């Protein structure tokens, strides 16, 4: 997760050695998620530990536990989590951990009534920060478990621990930034909205309007997405089939609509799009291999086997399999970010989806 031990590079970074830009971008996103934003790193790490426990990721849990041990507050939260007794935690911490559990188990993160407890304890910027953290660690747990990465010996060595200091409504659960607010935010916002190929103004996706509440995370996420495009081993339709399958599996309305728009732009026929919502009969054999893997990674990450990944590698090769995995993990993050925050879909996206399916419901 970090580089607190000099010269130590985590296995999740070395696993991406053939794609150094992606490795650097994921490490940068991990740093931004934990150390940037309005929330203290400790509460985000405690939420990350809950994600790791739910997803049975020993690798992620070991890294997070090591980082929690670097401060008194972190050690206190770790003791509570290890004992299973959260009653002595302050209310805001209990609410954050309950939200992390809910968002990991269901991208919609409970009812609006349940979410009010989150809103009573945290402001919009803090909610975006926490949601991004939970989304990222759902990304990371799936990535490291799919590759069966071993925990590094230095992570487990106490002597290596560094020292340190302390029902859906139509509106989103957080307020989206307006064009005027984005315009005065400074360089991070401009980097996101003015990058090559980016949309801006009224066309800026609502996911970015929300994420820009924590500019460092928004910039790190944008950097990762740009780096991922450089792998380019998958054809665009297969990549979108993966993200569509993950979003459908999670029941994420916002992301599903966006994938349909992307597939239509590639020229996928309405007939195939209609068939895709019923079953996989319209997919090619190659697409089915990718989609089957992505669905299992999404619904049962701890049940993924070496044979599952070998099947993917057999069809796509080492680099292509890694790209399928990264695409599925990307939407483990984004489904939780957009659906957990109940972000409304943009009017044009809704209309494009309605043109295909005759409804704006999944």
Set out the residue ranges of the language-model regions.
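Secretory/endomembrane lumenal or extracellular ectodomains immediately following the signal peptide
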Residues: 1-45, 69, 79, 151-238, ...
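Alpha-helical scaffold segments that form or flank carboxylate-/histidine-based iron centers
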Residues: 8-14, 41-55, 121, 126-131, ...
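Short alpha-helical scaffolding segments that buttress acidic/His motifs in well-ordered protein cores
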Residues: 16, 30, 46-51, 81, ...
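Short acidic alpha-helix initiation/capping motifs at coil-to-helix transition points
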Residues: 20-26, 56-60, 95, 104-112, ...
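Conserved alpha-helical segments that form or flank metal/cofactor-binding pockets of metalloenzymes
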Residues: 45-78, 246-271
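Acidic/histidine-rich alpha-helical segments that form the ligand environment
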Residues: 83, 88-133, 286-327
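Histidine/lysine/aspartate-rich catalytic loop segments that bind and position anionic ligands
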Residues: 84, 262-271, 276-284
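Preference for long, well-ordered alpha-helical segments
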Residues: 114, 124-164, 318-359
